[in-house]
């Protein structure tokens, strides 16, 4: 099941902001998301609900 882990990018490395339950050396897939800050206010009510449903169905939330 996908998990959302907040991280900060420093010196070319993503550093999680909380403890992560992974084995040392385990591979993960990182999805970088800055969408909220860049698109705030562009979408209106109905469109936003459809987008949220699509994101949730893809496992990002």
UniProtKB/Swiss-Prot annotation:
Keyword entries, A-Z: Toxin-antitoxin system
- Give TM regions: none
Report if keyword Magnesium is assigned. Answer: no
The superkingdom of the source organism is Archaea
Q: Where is the signal peptide?
A: none
Pfam families, alphabetized: AF2212-like
Coiled coil in keyword set: no
Its function, per the record, reads: Possibly the antitoxin component of a type II toxin-antitoxin (TA) system. Its cognate toxin is VapC13 (Potential).
Name the family the entry cites.
Answer: Belongs to the UPF0165 family.
What is this protein identified as? Putative antitoxin VapB13
- Give the species: Archaeoglobus fulgidus (strain ATCC 49558 / DSM 4304 / JCM 9628 / NBRC 100126 / VC-16)
């Amino acid at each position: 099941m996908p998990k959302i882990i907040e991280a900060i990018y420093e010196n070319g490395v993503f550093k999680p902001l909380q403890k992560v339950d992974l084995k040392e050396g385990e591979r993960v897939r990182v999805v970088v998301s800055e969408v909220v800050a860049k698109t705030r206010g562009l979408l209106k009510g109905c469109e936003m609900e459809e987008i949220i449903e699509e994101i949730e169905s893809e496992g990002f939330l």
